[in-house]
Design a protein with these regions (language model features):
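Active-site-adjacent structural elements that line small-molecule/cofactor binding pockets in enzymes
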Residues: 1-253
Length: 253
């Protein structure tokens, strides 16, 4: 089974669009909603960006849990950036969110990169060496797992395999080729792999993308807004049917 998600439109002055998109998606059957964690959209410091946790908390407090076999709805970050706030603060934010949606919070974590470094620098927030940021990420991931939360670590690099294994986390990749997903999901480590990326613009490509990811072993396909929730849910059903028919093993099995 492949679950579906959307990344909410939070590069706005108000949360209205994010709330509307979330309620539409969840009512249609999308499994989860996610938020970016940026001070501004990449390369656009003059544009607004809403913080993820207030948005997710408001939704978690107002949306009822479902009783279907798919569980949900899930609320997560894609991804929360280690280093923007101290680890203990980020841990507290996730634990607080989990009080509103027990068992349904996904702590997507990342270290940031050269594209997001300017956000730190603009506000005087240290941007440590990559190894230091990765160490902080694994430390936080372990603490979150200790609290019973689901954790995704961002990055498709081979080094992230060891980090995910050390933390007991899944691996999440952004706009990666299904071949990379398959390599990570069906390798000797048998990691859980989730996928996020922009929604295809061409008609018919959404279903093809979701089906390819399901065949590769991805357990989630999360698309940036805008994406048609009804088409996304239909694509996941088609992918599940196709995977069941082909007898493809699930990742980690």
């Amino acid at each position: 089974m492949i679950r579906t998600g959307i990344v909410l439109p939070t590069f706005r002055e108000t949360p209205d669009d994010a709330f509307a998109a979330a309620r539409r998606a969840l009512a249609t059957g999308v499994d989860g909603v996610f938020c970016y964690d940026h001070i501004w959209p990449l390369g656009q410091p003059d544009r607004p960006a809403l913080a993820p946790f207030p948005i997710l908390a408001a939704l978690a407090a107002s949306v009822d849990a479902t009783t279907t076999s798919r569980g949900g709805p899930y609320f997560g970050t894609l991804v929360a950036r280690v280093g923007l706030v101290p680890n203990r603060v980020l841990l507290g934010q996730f634990v607080g969110l989990a009080q509103l949606a027990p068992g349904r919070v996904i702590a997507g974590l990342g270290t940031g990169d050269r594209l997001s470094e300017a956000e730190n620098r603009a506000y005087g927030i240290p941007f440590g060496p990559a190894a230091e940021r990765r160490g902080d990420m694994v430390e936080l991931a372990r603490a979150l797992r200790g609290q019973g939360l689901t954790v995704w670590l961002a990055g498709g690099q081979a080094a992230r395999i060891d980090e995910a294994l050390a933390a007991g986390a899944a691996l999440t990749v952004w706009d990666a080729d299904p071949a990379l997903v398959s390599d990570r999901a069906h390798g000797a480590e048998a990691l859980e792999v989730t996928w996020g990326g922009p929604a295809p613009k061409a008609n018919g490509e959404l279903e093809a993308t979701v089906c390819a990811l399901a065949q590769a072993g991805a357990t989630w396909a999360v698309f940036g807004w805008p994406v048609d929730p009804a088409l996304l849910v239909a694509a996941a059903k088609s992918a599940d049917d196709e995977t069941a028919w082909s007898g493809e093993p699930e990742a980690g099995s």
